[in-house]
Amino acid sequence: MRPISTPAPRYPPEALRAGTSGEVLVELTVGTDGSITASRVLRAHPPRVFDREALNAVKRWRFEPVAAPVTTRRTLSFNPGG
């Protein structure tokens, strides 16, 4: 399973102002056409700060087409310094 496009998540403005960093572990399912058919947060630190933006970003990801749907996990990191 090879990514074609994995746009970075948007940084929540309130977290950026506060200098908050964190990580979100997302489970995602890639459909046969390479689009994301399902996604959910498995773990987030800090809780509920970056969840929405992580899921919004993952929904825009695209992979090369696959023979059968594939479920995988990815960690998205948020760091106000870049």
Predicted regions and their residues:
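Short proline/glycine- and basic residue-enriched helix-capping loop/turn segments at helix->loop/beta transitions
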Residues: 1-27, 52-82
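A short acidic/small-residue loop/turn micro-motif
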Residues: 13-14, 43-49
